[in-house]
Amino acid sequence: MSNKIRKGFTLIELLIVVVIIGILAAIAIPKFANTKEKAYLASMKSDLRNIATTQEAYFADFQVYVTGGASNVGGATGTTLNGFVPSSGVTVSSTASGGTGWTATSTHSGTSKTCAIGVGMTPPTPATVEGEPKCTP
């Protein structure tokens, strides 16, 4: 009788490894999807903060906010707001009221959520605090 040394993995060991990889993937994939959504929302909020900065700079110079509305602010088909250019995939719409206040909303092509900000006027939904961007849940 000869003693053969068997090398390699058994079928059970391979199945256990596959199950562990499956569990790790099931945990990781939703986390990555959520990260993408957070990045879209951060981009939209950043653009709204940039509009706020642009509006405040204009107000510091002329004691009024930029008046008139604009759809797709800074976009190829929209009105430029003092050189503001939105992030890729973001569309920003702005309205103003007689130079004493303004509101802006932003959307992203990668999500159905909307973010908004306002100063000197009733903030648009979902914004609730003046000057602070907020997004729909």
Briefly describe each language-model feature range.
Residues 10, 44, 52-53:
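Hydrophobic transmembrane-helix microenvironments that flank and shape a buried ionizable site
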Residues 49, 53-137:
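Periplasmic/extracellular, small/polar-rich flexible segments of pilin-like filament-forming proteins
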